[in-house]
A protein has these predicted regions:
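Feature captures the catalytic ectodomains and active-site-proximal regions of enzymes
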Residues: 1-513
Length: 513
C-alpha cells in the first residue's frame, strides 16, 4: 500500500475564471491555495457539459459532479445518453422501438409518436423525435403520425410555432410523418390527477374529438390569435378531407419520446392500463404496442421501456469495501447527501467499512450572514480523522464557495473562500505530518463569477468554468495531465494507492510519470 490516508477534498463551487471581475476566488486572500498551485502538480479540470454527461455548454451541478467522481466514469444523464445513442447509431437498434415497428408491419397498422415538442431538454428533446422518425423511415413504415405536446414553460411561451415549422421541414426531409393532433402540455402532461385535462388530450388522440384545424400551423395561429400560448393550447385534431388525419386504434404502436417520467405517466396510464377508471374511455381498453422512452412508472401495465436506468456498479465506495479498506465521508448538512448518496451512485446504504460524519450547517436565513458556515468544525474533524490513522481514504466537502456563491453577494463570497483557504491549510499540515496524500478539486464553479458580465446583474448560478485539480504530498516527480474531467479523479486515486482500476470505471488516471 501507498501513503495513508488518501484524501479527496472537494471545494464545492470553487471554479477558476480568467476574468477577475466579480470573482470571489480571485479577489479573496488565498495564500494556501496560491502556494499549492505553485508548488504541487496542478491543472484545470472540466466539470460541465459532456465532460460530466450533461448537454454541451450546460453548467455542472453538485449532484452530477459527485456522481461522476464517485463512479469513476462519465455518467450520462438521460438526455445526453439518448442523444449520444442517436449519434452513435445504437438508437436505431433499440429492441423496444424495433418491436413497436415490427408490430406495425405485422398488423399493417400505424405508428404514433407522442411527446413534448421543444428543445427545452427538461422532459424531452425535439431531436429525439427526429431520431424516431428516421428509424421509422429506415424500417419502411409509411403510416407515421405525430401527436404534439407544446411546451412554453421550459421554452419561450410562443416558441411552439417555430418548433412545428422545423418539424414539418424535418418530416419532409426524412420523408415520413404527419401531424395528427396538438395539445398544450397543460392538458397532455398533467401530473396532479387533473383527469379532466388529460381526458381532453386523450379524446383528441384516440377519438379525434376536440377543436379542429386544417394544419398544425393553422391550429397554432388560431390559438395565438386567442392569446392562448403553447402550454395552454386546447387539444386540437388536424383534419384532412373532413376526417381526422389519424386516431390511435387497436394494434397500433406508440413511441412516447419524453424521457422524464413525472408528466408522462397520466396520459400513458389512460392508454395502457386495462383497469383504468379515472375517466370514461368510449372505446374502453384496446391493445397497443406502447413504448415509453424511460420507465415512467413500474405499475403501468402493457408497455415497453426503451431506455432502462443504468445502474452504476463498482463505485469507488464499493471498490474500497471489496478491498477491506476503511473510508470516511465528511461534510456539513448542505453537502452531506453529495459525499454519501450521490458519490455512491444514488445508493443510500453505506458500504462496509464506510463511516460518515455530518456536521450541522448553521441555522441562518441565508449563508451570506455566516460565510464561514460550518467549515471550521468540518476542518477540525478532517484534521482529527487524518491524524487518527483509522482511515485509508477520506472523502470530504467544503460547502462554502457554492452555498455563499448562490447568494451573489461578493463580500460574503470572498469571506467564504478565505474561510475555506484556512481549512485547506490545516488539512495540508496534517497530511504532511502523517505523510498522507491529498487530491483537491471542485465539483463545479460558482463563486468565481458573481455577476452577469453582459448585463451587470448579480449572477447566482453555477458556471461552466474549469475547476482546480491539485495533487498534494504524493510521490515525488508526478505530473497531472491537462484536459481531464471529474470522472478521472477516482482512477487517479486508485493509481496513487497502487491498486488496479476496475473495468467498470472508464475514467483515466490523470497521472503522468
Amino acid at each position: 500500500m501507498s501513503k495513508k490516508p488518501t484524501v479527496l477534498m472537494i471545494l464545492d463551487g470553487y471554479g477558476l475564471n480568467e476574468n477577475s471581475e466579480a470573482n470571489a476566488v480571485a479577489e479573496a486572500k488565498t495564500p494556501v491555495m496560491d502556494k499549492l498551485m505553485k508548488e504541487y502538480p496542478f491543472v484545470k479540470g472540466n466539470a460541465s457539459g459532456m465532460a460530466v454527461g450533461l448537454p454541451e455548454g450546460q453548467m455542472g451541478n453538485s449532484e452530477v459532479g459527485h456522481m461522476n467522481m464517485g463512479a469513476g466514469r462519465i455518467v450520462y444523464q438521460e438526455l445526453t445518453r439518448i442523444t449520444k445513442e442517436i449519434q452513435d447509431g445504437d438508437f436505431f437498434k433499440n429492441e423496444a422501438m424495433l418491436e413497436a415497428i415490427e408490430n406495425c408491419k405485422k398488423n399493417d397498422s400505424a405508428l404514433h409518436c407522442f411527446g413534448l415538442l421543444s428543445d427545452g431538454g427538461v422532459h424531452s428533446h425535439n431531436t429525439h423525435l427526429y431520431g424516431v422518425l428516421e428509424m421509422a423511415k429506415r424500417n419502411g413504415l409509411e403510416n407515421v403520425y405525430v401527436h404534439l405536446f407544446l411546451d412554453g414553460r421550459d421554452t419561450a411561451p410562443t416558441s411552439g410555432k417555430g418548433f412545428i415549422e422545423e418539424l414539418l421541414a424535418k418530416m419532409d426531409e426524412i420523408g415520413v410523418g404527419k401531424v395528427a393532433s396538438i395539445s398544450g402540455r397543460y392538458y397532455a402532461m398533467d401530473r396532479d390527477n387533473r383527469w379532466d385535462r388529460v381526458q381532453k388530450a386523450y379524446n383528441a388522440i384516440v377519438m379525434g374529438q376536440g377543436n379542429t384545424a386544417d394544419s398544425a400551423i393553422d391550429a397554432i395561429d388560431a390559438s395565438y390569435k386567442e392569446d392562448v400560448t403553447d402550454e395552454f393550447v386546447v387539444p386540437t385534431v388536424i383534419i384532412e378531407n373532413c376526417e381526422p388525419v389519424a386516431t390511435l386504434k387497436e394494434n397500433d404502436s406508440v413511441i412516447f419520446y419524453n424521457f422524464r417520467p413525472d408528466r408522462a405517466r397520466e396520459i400513458t396510464r389512460s392508454i395502457c392500463d386495462d383497469k383504468f377508471d379515472s375517466f370514461d374511455r368510449p372505446n374502453g381498453y384496446f391493445k397497443t404496442t406502447f413504448v415509453c422512452f424511460t420507465e415512467y412508472d413500474v405499475t403501468i401495465p402493457n408497455k415497453l421501456v426503451a431506455f432502462h436506468k443504468v445502474e452504476i456498479k463498482n463505485t469507488f465506495g464499493e471498490f474500497l469495501a471489496q478491498h477491506g479498506l476503511k473510508q470516511l465521508r465528511l461534510a456539513e448538512t448542505e453537502k452531506y447527501a453529495h459525499v454519501t448518496f450521490f458519490f455512491n451512485g444514488g445508493v443510500e446504504e453505506p458500504n462496509e467499512g464506510e463511516d460518515r460524519i455530518l456536521v450541522k450547517s448553521p441555522a441562518v436565513a441565508t449563508y451570506d450572514l455566516q460565510p464561514e458556515m460550518s467549515a471550521p468544525e468540518v476542518g477540525a474533524k478532517l484534521v482529527e480523522a487524518i491524524k487518527s490513522d483509522k482511515y485509508d481514504v477520506i472523502i470530504m466537502n467544503f460547502a462554502n464557495s457554492d452555498m455563499v456563491g448562490h447568494t451573489g453577494i461578493e463580500e460574503a463570497a470572498i469571506k467564504a473562500v478565505e474561510a475555506v483557504d484556512k481549512c485547506v491549510g490545516d488539512a495540508v499540515e496534517a497530511i504532511k505530518e502523517v505523510n498522507g496524500q491529498m487530491f483537491i478539486c471542485a465539483d463545479h464553479g460558482n463563486a468565481e463569477q458573481l455577476k452577469d458580465y453582459e448585463t451587470g446583474a448579480p449572477f447566482t448560478a453555477h458556471t461552466t468554468n474549469p475547476v482546480p485539480f491539485i495533487l498534494v504530498n504524493a510521490e515525488e516527480g508526478l505530473k497531472l495531465r491537462e484536459g481531464g474531467c471529474l470522472a478521472d479523479i477516482v482512477p487517479t486515486l486508485i493509481e496513487l494507492m497502487g491498486m488496479e482500476q476496475p473495468a467498470e470505471m472508464t475514467g483515466k488516471s490523470l497521472i503522468v510519470k
